[in-house]
């Protein structure tokens, strides 16, 4: 499974690790992803999603239905 947030689409960022001597080596900055069971009122059940912590915070204010509609995902498949 890809390391990508299922609601926002967040994924890893390519960056540089810069040493004290200013040498640069490529490094992946991964998104902070967590498995989360979210209550889905319309389906009357829990839905298990892999979400970024930013998405979890947004989920509390917007709600699961609004975010799923924006992402274009069908919650019946989860």
UniProtKB/Swiss-Prot annotation:
UniProt cross-references to InterPro entries, sorted A to Z: Ribosomal_bL28, Ribosomal_bL28/bL31-like_sf, Ribosomal_bL28_bact-type, Ribosomal_bL28_sf
One BP annotation, GO: translation
Entry GO MF terms: structural constituent of ribosome
GO cellular component: ribonucleoprotein complex; ribosome
SUPFAM superfamilies in the cross-refs: L28p-like
Presence of keyword Ribonucleoprotein: yes
Record's keyword terms, sorted: Ribonucleoprotein, Ribosomal protein
Superkingdom, taxonomy of origin: Bacteria
The keyword Metal-binding is assigned to this record: no
NCBIfam families: L28 (TIGR00009)
Family: Belongs to the bacterial ribosomal protein bL28 family.
Family annotation (PANTHER family): 39S RIBOSOMAL PROTEIN L28, MITOCHONDRIAL, LARGE RIBOSOMAL SUBUNIT PROTEIN BL28M
Name recorded for this polypeptide: Large ribosomal subunit protein bL28
Organism listed in the record: Synechocystis sp. (strain ATCC 27184 / PCC 6803 / Kazusa)
Organismal lineage: Bacteria, Bacillati, Cyanobacteriota, Cyanophyceae, Synechococcales
């Amino acid at each position: 499974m890809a390391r990508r947030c299922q609601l926002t689409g967040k994924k890893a960022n390519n960056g540089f690790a810069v040493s004290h001597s200013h040498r640069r080596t490529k490094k992946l900055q991964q998104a902070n992803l967590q498995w989360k069971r979210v209550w889905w009122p319309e389906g009357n059940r829990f839905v298990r999603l892999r979400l970024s912590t930013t998405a979890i915070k947004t989920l509390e204010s917007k709600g699961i239905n609004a975010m799923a509609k924006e992402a274009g995902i069908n919650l019946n498949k989860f």
